[in-house]
Amino acid sequence: AINAPASGRMAVAEAITNLLAAPIELPRVKLSANWMAACGEPGEDAALYETVKAVGMELCPALGVSIPVGKDSLSMRTQWSEGSDKKKVTSPVSLIVSAFASLSDVRGTLTPQLNATEADTTLVLIDLGKGQNRMGGSILGQTLDQSGDVVPDVDDPQDLVNLVNAVNALRAKGQILAYHDRSDGGLLAAAAEMAFAGHVGVALNVDLLVTEGDGVSDSRMDTGDAKNWAGQVSARREELTLKALFNEELGVLLQVRTAERNDVMQTLREHGLSKFSHFVGKTRPVSSEIDAGKGELQVWRDAKAVFSAPLADLHQVWDAVSWKICQQRDNPVNADAEHAAAGEPTDPGLHVHLTFDAADNVAAPYLNLAKPKVAILREQGVNSHIEMAYAFTEAGFEAFDVHMTDLQTGRVKLEDFKGVVA
């Protein structure tokens, strides 16, 4: 069943995990909320009320963020007739969230682009869904024409607060090389997009994500008679693998140096996140000592590669929809050329090639570093001349206190100054 309050909570949470690529502080985060619903339809008013309550009165206060601005679109339905048949499409309650925050320092902003110069790095998944892998509303479900029953949710706002604090702590230590939130398409899509951006191969390992129970007191893997157990376990493992790769629970994927991953896990432990943080993969840059997986996206389970494909092929598929739209909107020749370059390892993309040394100050030979002299005229009844002199001094001038009698007697000449302030 559709869970309107959960969708609202997830909209806020995903806006924050998107923003977390920058060094944000939660008290500085402000949200713009666009509430959309088909008011008057059965159950929709109640769903809207519950969603507003969940977001505005529960989640946001718990996170310490505010919603100073927003709008509403409360007629989200359309009706028409086809002959004697009346048709109607009604949209579910939706919340569109835009997040913004002022930063004390814009440096330290992270991107999804995998670092290609580090030879040995690890991917760390911080799974705020805590292994529930709820598939309702997922992209995978939609491709199979299924909406699902149980949807992802923000079960504990404190986990999100802890995530922000942990990522900022790791950022301050310089231990995060790349960052991407898990959202549309799940873990596999996030890893693929990071690999596309960096032209770096990735080998994911889902062993820790497909384990159920402890095998002793919790034996969820015991799904039937012993004679069918092997087949049932195999089918269940396939299902769990798909859920691990494509669930869209709240979470983030980090690239860290393998030599520092234990330190990273200790930081996550200090912020209460280690129990649901996992080492889920390794990168395969050109400089990697392991050749298998270079230029590919692989998924490993039980010491076997259950999926492997060249990054270039996956990038072409990933770009296909945008390419088709671009063909209709822009010059088709340019659209085709851009699509052909998608995933090409030798394509440098947008880049800068300077024909000079950026460290050189080309204006230096022409600069006159002498401070211009400026006369601050003073006469009886004048005030603020001291503040004016201070302002010009701070601006790089050499300020002189000049009284009108100085000019009358010839002690000072205006021709000696570059400017006069009166």
State where each predicted segment sits.
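Core alpha-helical transmembrane segments of integral membrane proteins
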Residues: A15, L19, K373, N383-H385, ...
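Catalytic core of tubulin tyrosine ligase-like
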Residues: L254
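Short phosphate-binding/catalytic loops that engage adenosine nucleotides
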Residues: I24, L273, F397
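A glycine-rich phosphate/pyrophosphate-binding beta-strand-loop-alpha-helix module
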Residues: I2-T78
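Catalytic nucleophile loop
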Residues: P23, D181, V420-A422
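Flexible gly/pro-rich beta->alpha loop and the following alpha-helix that scaffold active-site loops
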Residues: I386, A391-A422
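Intein/HINT protein-splicing elements and their conserved insertion hotspots or analogous self-processing inserts
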Residues: A1, L48-T51, S66-E248, R257-K373, ...
